[in-house]
Regions:
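Pore- and gate-forming transmembrane helices of large, multi-pass membrane proteins
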Residues: 261, 296, 313-351, 370
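Small-residue-enriched core segments of transmembrane alpha-helices in multipass membrane transport
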Residues: 257-278, 293, 357-374
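Transmembrane helix-loop junctions at the membrane interface of multipass transporters and ion channels
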Residues: 1, 277, 281, 343-360, ...
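Alpha-helical transmembrane segments of multi-pass membrane proteins
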Residues: 26-30, 226, 230, 234, ...
Length: 391
């Protein structure tokens, strides 16, 4: 008749979460000056690391040093040529303009200069075909391994040559041609540095009437990296601005909106400090971390501050308002952080470095946001309440 099952115990389930929450917010309430001061000192000490964050992307570094992709690339580049590619496009306005000996001679001189760069292993252009034919039709005399001075002779060589591969380097109107450079560097910044030197050389030495531009896969990669990272940085600032605006509309108070931004900006600082300290690049993968961390962190801040402010308006004392708020919302924000960070931390097991960094930094951002909401935010609220009471 009687139910003999044991009564539920208060320590079951996720009761341990409540103990963690209490320990954090009670520390923030009891020692607000210490918590606030030590947090500011800690962030200040980490600020110099922000200048060590390097904006860089290198596809080779996305894999471990012993990964077949990297080892095979190193082997190929050691015996043949660099796998990177830059194409310098040359164009004239007139038909057959690239049969001009001056233009062809400049293309060859540019190749000679480029091949002296440590980053360039090899170069090929239409001028190589003409130079080779001029040398071959003159008994392979080394003195004739040059571009002929007579445009008519160049036309005759091209008339005789029937290889289709020539038109891989020049169009059939002989108005557009390109010099293909095989480069052995892969970081976007180093590729950009090579392109800058090429631009300087051509700008100083190109003959009048010869238009030029740099293209190729490596140029695309360098530009893509720059545009992507800049776009992500701009989107981060846009997200912060939008969050601040929504906070302002929600709380109808400039001070409250600014206050709620502190726990949301702090994870970003911590993420970039960690990146600077451990040499993690800001690349196309890690650029997304800050925006995601902010988007998730703002949810916890709204839970905490909404509960606190609504109780303050009801006439409850600040200490009791914080205690009741965390008693109600503390378990939820901690459990949410545990679940989300567990999903992201699994990515650390990946062999692909961007995925590993993405999962690690996102988890760090989530836990940082939680600590700031449970510890730093209560200390600020207590200091503000004390200041208001004193006034």
């Amino acid at each position: 008749v009687w139910d003999s099952a044991p009564w539920p115990r208060t320590g079951a389930g996720v009761q341990w979460v409540d103990r963690i929450v209490r320990r954090f917010y009670r520390t923030g309430i009891r020692y607000p000056v210490w918590v606030f001061g030590l947090t500011i000192i800690g962030l200040g000490a980490g600020i110099p690391a922000l200048w060590d964050v390097k904006v860089e992307t290198n596809l080779q570094e996305f894999f471990a040093p012993d990964h077949p992709t990297r080892s095979d690339t190193r082997h190929f580049e050691s015996i043949i040529a660099g796998t990177g590619n830059l194409d310098v496009i040359f164009e004239t306005q007139a038909r057959d303009g690239l049969k001009n000996p001056e233009y062809l001679a400049f293309m060859r001189s540019f190749q000679t200069w480029a091949e002296k760069l440590a980053e360039v292993d090899k170069s090929v252009s239409a001028a190589d075909f003409i130079e080779e034919m001029h040398w071959g039709f003159n008994a392979e005399d080394p003195a004739f391994r040059t571009i002929p001075d007579d445009p008519k002779l160049i036309s005759q060589y091209l008339f005789i040559y029937d290889g289709e591969d020539l038109f891989d380097f020049v169009d059939q109107e002989f108005q557009v041609s390109h010099v293909s450079l095989s480069i052995n560097v892969h970081p976007a910044n180093e590729i950009a540095a090579v392109m800058d030197r090429i631009r300087v050389y051509i700008s100083e030495h190109a003959p009048p009437g010869l238009q030029w531009e740099i293209a190729g896969y490596s140029r695309l990669f360098a530009d893509m990296e720059e545009l992507l990272v800049k776009g992500q940085v701009y989107s981060l600032w846009g997200a912060l601005g939008l969050i601040f605006l929504l906070m302002l509309i929600l709380w109808r108070s400039l001070g409250s909106a600014l206050l709620c931004m502190i726990p949301n900006i702090s994870p970003i600082l911590i993420i970039f400090i960690v990146m600077g300290l451990f040499g993690i690049w800001l690349d196309m993968a890690t650029a997304m971390v800050a925006s995601i961390a902010v988007g998730i962190a703002v949810d916890d801040t709204i839970h905490v501050y909404h509960g606190y402010s609504s109780r303050i308006r009801a006439g409850i004392l600040p200490v009791k308002a914080l205690v009741r708020t965390f008693s109600q919302a503390g378990r939820a924000v901690v459990t949410t952080t545990i679940i989300l960070s567990a999903q992201f931390i699994i990515l650390v097991l990946s062999y692909f470095q961007p995925t590993t960094h993405f999962g690690l930094l996102t988890s760090i951002g989530l836990w940082t946001a939680l600590v700031f909401d449970l510890l730093f935010l209560p200390s600020i609220l207590m200091l503000l309440a004390y200041k208001k009471k004193k006034e």
